[in-house]
Curated annotation (Swiss-Prot):
Protein name: N-acetylneuraminate-9-phosphate synthase
Source species: Drosophila melanogaster (Fruit fly)
Example of a GO MF term: N-acylneuraminate-9-phosphate synthase activity
Keywords tagged on the record: Transferase
Record lineage: Eukaryota, Metazoa, Ecdysozoa, Arthropoda, Hexapoda
Gene name of this polypeptide: Nans
Gene Ontology biological-process annotations: carbohydrate biosynthetic process; CMP-N-acetylneuraminate biosynthetic process; glycosylation; N-acetylneuraminate biosynthetic process; protein glycosylation
Reaction catalysed by this enzyme: aldehydo-N-acetyl-D-mannosamine 6-phosphate + phosphoenolpyruvate + H2O = N-acetylneuraminate 9-phosphate + phosphate; aldehydo-D-mannose 6-phosphate + phosphoenolpyruvate + H2O = 3-deoxy-D-glycero-beta-D-galacto-non-2-ulopyranosonate 9-phosphate + phosphate
SUPFAM superfamilies (alphabetical): AFP III-like domain, Aldolase
Gene3D superfamilies the record matches: Aldolase class I, Antifreeze-like/N-acetylneuraminic acid synthase C-terminal domain
Limits of the AFP-like domain: 314-372
Length: 372
């Protein structure tokens, strides 16, 4: 598979292109099949979905909250998400359809149960989305699978990315890639921070670096390739005007085709092109220049905070816990919580800590719930 050769470093002049269907299928298998065909025609190597086990990913309060939005598919957030989830049989249908069309099929594992589900499907690789990039229990479990990993790094600091790489190294995992990503939908060009691709390539020379973009248009994604990204992922839709929050920052078929054609025509090497030359080559404007502005290091950007606040994961109680109890691993879970609690990154640090309050099952563990 092309992705394996890119991750291993055997190929430096090829790009693996992923069409992120996500949940833009509107909960319809036939629409998903049509999207797979359109992505194949556009020249993509892979189509990717998003797999969630809702009770494993969200707390009950997060699922039960009222969801008022023009994009809602249900009265509660749980009903909305359930409408967009495919069953195992439906995933098998889509996987078989991809096999017929000779296009890779996979999904993001949004929780540990979904990771197990995708592993059992024997997908060619598993994606770990930005919302789980600091979910180290999930990352460790994924690293122990005999499957390549593609890990997005939106909403994370460079310190967290370094910890991801350390986690992979400690697990003996070599077949993985890191994706530069900004979790803002759509991403303003000035926030795209494309130079982080070069920063990541320099910091982690033995790791394949890719780009997961949420900007409008295709020129910034083309620039990412010229900077050294060898995996490109873009959200894909049949129609940007459709109901659903991801459609606006997705590419329609003709845009996706334009992107794959441009990338295929690039003559690539292991040496990234300087930003000034990229702007000239692509006939870029001020927006491309803004996307290519100098960046010192990776931080959580202000534009990412809405997504982080909505979908960032917290540490919650896996069962009812009493005041004075000292936490063990089995007492905690990592979920999207309403309200939010301590971040997933703190999970292992809480082992042995004493609770200052009673905490009910599925309730978030807050900073003031811990006696330091």
């Amino acid at each position: 598979m092309l992705l394996n050769d890119i991750i291993s470093g055997k190929l430096v002049d090829s790009v693996y292109i992923i069409a992120e269907i996500g949940q833009n299928h509107q909960g319809c298998v036939e629409t998903a099949k049509k999207m797979i065909w359109e992505a194949k025609k556009a020249g993509c190597h892979c189509v990717k979905f998003q797999k969630s086990d809702l009770p494993a990913k969200f707390t009950r309060s997060a699922l039960d909250r009222e969801y008022i939005s023009d994009h809602a598919w249900g009265k509660t957030y749980g009903e909305h998400k359930e409408y967009l989830e495919f069953s195992k049989d439906q995933y098998l249908q889509l996987q078989a359809h991809c096999k017929e069309l000779n296009v890779d099929f996979t999904a993001s594992a949004m929780d540990e149960r979904s990771l197990e589900f995708l592993s059992a499907l024997n997908v060619p690789f598993i994606k770990i989305g930005s919302g789980d990039a600091n979910n180290f229990p999930l990352l460790k479990k994924a690293a122990n699978l005999n499957l390549p990993l593609v890990i997005s790094t939106g909403m994370q600091t460079m310190q967290t990315v370094e910890r991801i790489v350390q986690t992979m190294r400690e697990s003996g995992k070599e077949d993985y890639a890191l994706m530069h990503c900004v979790s803002s939908y759509p991403t303003d060009p000035k926030d795209c921070s494309l130079q982080l691709i070069s920063v990541l390539r320099t910091r982690f020379p033995n790791v394949a670096i890719g780009y997961s973009g949420h900007e409008l248009g295709v020129i910034i994604s083309q620039a990412a390739v010229l900077l050294g990204a060898r995996i490109v992922e873009r959200h894909f839709t049949l129609d940007k005007s459709q109901k659903g929050s991801d459609h606006r920052c997705s590419l329609e078929p003709q845009e996706l085709k334009a992107l794959t054609t441009a990338i295929t025509n690039f003559k690539l090497s292991s040496v990234p092109m300087p930003p000034q030359e990229i702007v000239k080559k692509l006939n870029g404007d001020e927006e491309l220049e803004a996307a290519l502005q100098h960046v010192e290091s990776k931080t959580i950007l202000p534009c990412e905070l809405p997504c982080r606040n909505k979908l960032g994961k917290s540490i919650v109680a896996a069962r009812n816990l009493n005041k004075g109890y000292r936490l063990q691993l089995a007492d905690m879970a990592i979920k999207v919580s309403e309200p939010s609690g301590l971040t997933a990154e703190d999970f292992l640090d809480l082992v042995g800590k004493e609770l200052a309050d009673n905490i009910g099952e599925d309730e978030p563990i807050l900073g003031n719930s811990i006696i330091n």
